[in-house]
Structures are given as C-alpha cells and as structure tokens.
Amino acid sequence: MERYIGTYQTFQTVSRKEAANLIGADNLIGDRYSIECTIEDGVQKAWLVNRFDQRVGYFEPKYSRELSILKAQGMTLVAVLSFVAFTDHPEPGYYWGDVAVFAFDPAYQTTMETFITSVSKEIGKGRRPRVQLETRGIENIIESNGTWLPSETVPYPAKEKGTALVKTHRSITDRLVEESRKGNKGCYLLSWAFLLSVVAFAILGMKSCGLF
C-alpha cells in the first residue's frame, strides 16, 4: 500500500440543484469532503459528499475506478474544495469544480489529518499548494508530523472564453459562516448583520438612483 497519493481533480454536478448547493454557504472553498465510491448502471462513479451528507458532485468513470481501487486497498480518501467554475456552453451552461484529493495509509492518520488541515487553510486563502509529491515530499510530511507544507503552488486553469471561476477563496462572509459552524454565536449574528447591511446599502443605492 502507498503511504500517500495527492492530486487536483475536476468534478461535475448532476443538476442545477446540486450546483446551487455547491455555490452556497454549505460548500466553502477549503471545505473537506468524503468520497463515496459506487457502481451505477455498471459504471464506476465516485461522489463528493460534504459535511452535511449531501452529494455535490462526481468524478469521471476512469478516475472513479482509480479511487475505488485505492479504497479497496484500505487507503483513506479525503477531498478539499479548490474552486467552483461555470461554463456557458453547451446552453444553458453548467457548474463544475476542482478538488485536492488525498489518499493515505490509515497508519499515518494523525499526521495526514494535520497536513490536510494546513492545505485546506491555504486553499481557503486562494493558494493551491502542490499536493502531488515525490518520495522526499512524503517523507517531509511524515517526519514533521504533518506540519510541513510544500512551497510550490498549482495555478488555476488558464482563462477560457465562456468559462468563469466563480469561487476561488473564502470571502469575509464565508469566514464568518465557518466560525458560526463552530458554534461561535457572535460570528453567526455578525454574519447576518453583515448580510443585512449589504442589502440595506443596495436598497439605499437604488433609491438614490431613483429606481423606486
């Protein structure tokens, strides 16, 4: 069994319902996902499942098969949301995304949890650390008990006509949402106050422009 395998991988959404969940507050950049390996109509399909037990997207069959093999070998699978994108063709367009995928030997659970948490924080800031590592990089993780981070980063995809990256980092509101998830009531109230203030300013702006 390998000690560690990491990569960035794109995924698709089934419908606009899943896409709506993906761009909402239940799925923030840097969030962690479990991976559920299934066989549907004889085809391998690995699903991304968020902390609220919602399926938000799936990988293409070839990569899904690779993940199912790793899982059958006993490796732990974890994914971290890297970005969300929208492509307007073919009409009516569709949402898709990218995640950092980690597979590791459960014997290194604590070390890898620490490493993945650090990578998640960096991704939340809009920085994508390189996770596809050679032997030396893997040894750095283990020797540091997970505190080591690669200095190299992976760039976002080049701009393409008809495609836009709609989520690449955590906004101020996203960070407040995350604190409220942790039970910080003050941040929960502050996040609502912030959203209401944005709405209020928008209304005042429209009034000043004579729109109503």
Residue ranges: model-predicted function:
Residues M1-F212:
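Conserved active-site motif detector
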